[in-house]
Regions:
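Long, contiguous binding/interaction regions
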Residues: 1-76
């Protein structure tokens, strides 16, 4: 598959703030993640990032994020 880049905004619920979600996304799905902006408080987290990988890996990674309870929105 061809390499692809996605710009995404991830919104984390409070129970996942202390989990290594971005690390796992990068490691388990072989996605290069560049954090562009992050805001984390005691009750939520929001991260804007760029994700680079094969299209199939990106789709699998995004699906996994959603399964974890993370809201994933594309950034134009």
């Amino acid at each position: 598959m061809a390499p692809a880049r996605r710009r995404l905004r991830l919104t984390f619920p409070s129970d996942l703030i202390h989990e290594p979600i971005i690390y796992r996304l990068a490691r388990e799905f072989d996605i290069v993640v560049t954090v562009r902006r992050a805001e984390v408080t005691s009750d939520h987290g929001s991260v804007a990032l760029e994700a680079d990988a094969d299209e199939e890996q990106l789709e699998r990674g995004i699906a996994w994020l959603a399964q974890q309870g993370i809201n994933v929105e594309p950034i134009a």
